């Protein structure tokens, strides 16, 4: 019986693999680089030189133009792909057993055909020739199957092939019935020859059936071989008629040679183990392939002793003298049995005694008696013709009757043996059917195992894919964190810049306040001067020079009035500009509402907006730099203003000196006061108007102070916004830490699941080991022939194996479903969380962008206001300088001043 396949578990997929969601496993894709790997596998030494010199052997066609060591694919020296000839010394390590088996089977078939044609040349044996040809073809097929048994399962043969031995046995029984000898026949010699041929043919057919019933069972069951050997011994030892009638030698008729075409290496082990008698040992020696070939060549072929031109027939024995000597030595004890005429009664008594001897003793003594009876005609032929013995008819009839009885007994024995063979063949067919059923179950189990392995591979691929996705997500999160940190750094820089600009604005505002205080001081000094002038006017009423001073004061006051009118116009223009800006801001607010409505559309263009945001940030930074430069310019201009103020103080001192000179002039102008008495009333009116203008300018200063306070409030609001953004950043960091904790928990769960899978695989391996042990037990039990009593145990073992396999399959399926469900949920949750966090971050970025744009606009407005104030101050200073440079006695024209010329007295 053929042995079932070993159920080996393929556990190499997971051994040594450590799964982690963050670390991406190295890719197994082969790179296109050629030089390093090929140089590492480059053959070197004498073997490389010898292989390079053999241009015709093992030469692979290169893919490029020429075959060089770099372009040739490196292979080991003793690879299976290289077909080494049998004569080379390298073939010692790799024997080509398949080709030897095929050639051996072909030789066996051919030699058997030659032998059968040489022995059975009569037309009555054509059927045997036909059957032998079929058997040789079957043997070739069986040998091919046995040669490829390492690649196929042992029970892949169809049931129709297993039923063929039973059909052959039935056909052989039919031929035995047809070829059984009749009781009465006209010619006794023909009758004996027919009986001998039929007995030999039947024995050979039965032996052929036994040997070819299951060709693969020879190497696994010693009991079947022993049984077939015993049957062959019975047929060969009891074949008396054939030995008497045929002219062959006793050495040739001692045992019929039955050729088994599927004789492999297992036959030698079986024949060495079957050591029953000397005949079995001789058969073991004769069953080798070389001994068979030598025997057949001795029987069929011709020998050329000296030359190859004239063949000489080989005689088995040239001289017959040794037979004469043996017969003379053997006949010293029983001389009377040679001739039935001298001592007929003794021969009869000896025959009767021999009939009563036990079967074992007769089997031992038959060979010597047969040799004597077979040698007798040759001895008589060699002696003189007058000395030939004459046999009586009674003796011949008696011998014939004995032979017929023996033939009948042998036929009964053959029928009994054939019945036993039928029983055994039925049992074999039943066992083969059982084995086929078991094989189908094994195939189903293997298919289930393959499916499980495929499912495991799919699960591993899914796990690796999920790990890669997790790694990519972690990388994306890290990239986003880096961007957030960059934005934080930019925000901190912008905050510092805002603080610096705010400080600079405060300094500028303080400087403006100082300038305003200085202006107030100057105005107070002017008022003091006017008071002093009034005092001087009260004291010097008579002088006409005092009128001139009053005229100069009137001209200065008219200039100041003109300046205040210009300031009022500027303030009105600024008011209109503020109104226009408020309208524009309202429109922008409406635009912002529309933008909020279109926020969903803008989410699709997040990537573009991020790039635009980066560009805008760069532009904002550039604008901030430009603004800082402008602020620096303002500072320089401020310094210039300070220098100008110093100059003005010096000019004030000079003006004081000039006042003393004016006092001197007042004494001279006392005479002209009478002319200007009428103009005093007009001057008083003008002074009132100027006071009203001063009040308006004070109100404008208060409005400017309110604006400055509003700017300070906006700066505070910006600081609050920055603090809120910092809190949001802290929240994002906490969310990231929570996500890291979730990922670590997932990794732990992954490790636990991997451990569970490994445990399940160990359980599967244990079940497979139990299954293999059960199969081995089944094989051993079937080899012993105890199928009837142990089928229940086999079925129980199969049930246990099937139940264990079903449990493992169900458990693996449950684990796979749980893994898939958990990972799908986690993946969806993580993706949703990441999306929400990214949306929040993007919204925050948009809000920060808008707030920064607003802050920049407000700062630009503040800078414009500061520039306007600076320009106004510069105008005032220039006008003051221009007024101081002119002659104080010079009067303003009425067209420019808009004041009526006073009437003189």
Curated annotation (Swiss-Prot):
Q: State where composition is biased (Basic residues).
A: 888-905
InterPro entries documented for this protein: TACC_fungi
Q: What is this protein called?
A: Autophagy-related protein 23
Q: Where in the cell is it found?
A: Cytoplasm; Membrane
As for what it does, the entry says: Required for cytoplasm to vacuole transport (Cvt) vesicle formation and efficient autophagy. Plays a role in ATG protein retrieval from the pre-autophagosomal structure (PAS) and is especially required for autophagy-dependent cycling of ATG9. Also plays a role in regulation of filamentous growth.
State the membrane topology.
Answer: Peripheral membrane protein
Keyword Transport, does the record have it?
A: yes
Origin species, per record, is Debaryomyces hansenii (strain ATCC 36239 / CBS 767 / BCRC 21394 / JCM 1990 / NBRC 0083 / IGC 2968) (Yeast)
Protein family (similarity comment): Belongs to the ATG23 family.
Q: Where is this region: Disordered?
A: 18-200, 879-905
**Which Gene3D superfamilies would you find in this protein's record?**
1.10.287.1490
| Name of encoding gene | ATG23
Q: What keywords sit in the KW lines?
A: Autophagy, Coiled coil, Cytoplasm, Membrane, Protein transport, Transport
Disulfide-bond pairs as recorded = none
